[in-house]
Amino acid sequence: MKKIFIASDHAGYNLKNSIISKLKKITDLGPKTSDSVDYPDYARKLSKKVASNKGSFGILICGSGMGMAIAANKNKNIRAALCYSKKNTKLSRLHNNANIITCLLYTSDAADE
């Protein structure tokens, strides 16, 4: 069975826990609280797990999704993709063989600017 790992920064803590509650088999790599943390630490931790467990996948969550993707992609054998729609997520796997998806919390529109 393929392993799925998940991690976030403090901004993604609640979404991470929501995802965990919906999946039967997933390994939570932290953080364990919503206290402020450095996202690169969690991107590195998850990337190492995915790289060392052949066929596994990862989910990283932060405010923009970009920081986690950049940090994860610095690791060997990692292909992290920022996913913001069902189609984008599917294509990242089919065409780019992504083994980590990064999710964003913050979006922007004209009303927010």
Q: What positions do the PLM features span?
A:
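A short, Lys/Arg-enriched amphipathic alpha-helix followed by its capping loop at the start of a domain
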Residues: S18-K25
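Short, acidic/small-residue loops that bind anionic groups at enzyme active sites
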Residues: N75-L104
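N-terminal beta1-alpha1 ligand-phosphate binding loop
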Residues: I4-N17
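Helix-adjacent hinge/juxtasegments
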Residues: K48-A80
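Conserved small/polar residues in nucleotide/adenosyl-binding loops
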Residues: Y106-A111
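A short beta-strand-loop structural module common to alpha/beta enzyme folds
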Residues: I26-V37
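Glycine-rich oxoanion-binding loops at beta->alpha junctions
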Residues: D35-A51
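Short beta-strand segments
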Residues: A7, L60-G65, C83-Y84, T102-L104
